[in-house]
Regions:
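Active-site-adjacent loops and short helices of periplasmic peptidoglycan-processing enzymes
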Residues: 1-90, 94-103
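Domain-terminus/edge residues, biased toward the C-terminal soluble/receptor-binding domains
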Residues: 70, 81-86, 90-301
């Protein structure tokens, strides 16, 4: 159980009305934070995990840098206005990508209505602040926030047909504006983009690679690694696969040994590199192999 300090209980903004001195399960507070944007629950969790709210914020800033959020600095854990507290839509999207890696987040983010039972027996209703959970087909996560200074904000995610999109809206004029704008972004993305499978691990490469000093004259090659790109519909032909392969390879080789690579080029810019490996093993050529090469296999059959 997590103890609730006076500091946590005294948080303004969205809250679940925690009582100072009560203790609640960690999962209850986490759910309150994800579903109800509860600032008091957020501070209570931070104090529990790191000993103080400030140490929690310090760790948030460290993690932001680890995630590449170069234009973000946290002064508090709640998002309430403070000097030096800032972020960008791109950084919020990066943070959302990280959140999507955690199944527990999805478990709570899709809850529409719930409640918190306090130690005293008092009950606080929880309503998901992300209306798109109910109103937009495929939306299964997101976080809202609003202050006079920042306006109405949301980072939401939706998935259709195996393609997941993230929409970030900052500074909307009203709550409905942020939801409408995010929904419009999703509509545009799903209508105009698709996932294009560029490479599949294990796919054979056309032709074979000559082998020097091996018991086989050549071997098959295959790709090692999957690559799928999010592309505007109708632009798939702009992707090029440019091989970087030697004229031959030297035996011996095990299956899976690196041989070369394939560059993935989009509009003249290299965006990825996929390893090319041996699709079969080849040993060194022995005396009998040499004779077979010279005189023909019929002598040994």
């Amino acid at each position: 159980p997590v103890p609730v300090s006076q500091t946590a209980a005294g948080m303004g903004g969205s809250q679940v009305l925690l009582d100072a001195g009560e203790t609640l399960p960690f999962e209850t507070l986490l759910k309150s934070m994800i579903v109800g944007s509860a600032n008091d629950a957020t501070v209570a969790i931070g104090e529990y995990l790191y000993g103080s709210h400030q140490l929690f914020v310090d760790r948030m800033n460290e993690r932001a840098q680890e995630l590449g959020m170069a234009d973000t600095h946290f002064v508090n854990s709640t998002g309430l206005p403070a000097e030096g507290h800032y972020t960008t839509a791109r950084d919020v999207a990066r943070m959302t990508v990280e959140m999507l890696k955690h199944p527990l987040y999805f478990e709570y983010s899709t809850i529409w209505l719930d409640s918190v039972i306090h130690e005293s027996g008092r009950e606080t209703q929880l309503t998901n602040t992300n209306r798109l959970i109910r109103l937009y087909d495929g939306c299964d996560g997101g976080k809202t926030g609003s202050t006079n200074e920042a306006g109405y904000c949301i980072s939401a995610t939706a998935e259709r047909g195996g393609m997941r999109l993230i929409a970030v809206v900052l500074g909307a004029q009203s709550s409905s504006d942020r939801f409408d704008t995010a929904a419009s972004m999703f509509d545009y993305g799903f209508a105009n983009y698709r996932l294009y499978p560029v490479a599949k691990s294990g796919a054979k490469i056309k032709g074979e690679m000559p082998v020097e000093g091996g018991n086989l004259p050549s071997i098959a090659l295959m790709l090692q690694g999957d690559l799928t790109l999010l592309m505007k519909k109708g632009t798939e032909q702009s992707v090029e696969l440019l091989p970087n392969l030697p004229q031959s390879v030297q035996a011996p080789l095990d299956m899976g040994d690196a041989v070369g690579s394939v560059d993935v080029v989009l509009d003249g810019r290299k965006i990825a590199r996929i390893a090319v490996v041996a699709a079969q093993a080849v040993g060194r050529q022995d005396f009998a192999d040499g004779l077979r090469r010279v005189f023909g296999r019929w002598l040994f059959q």
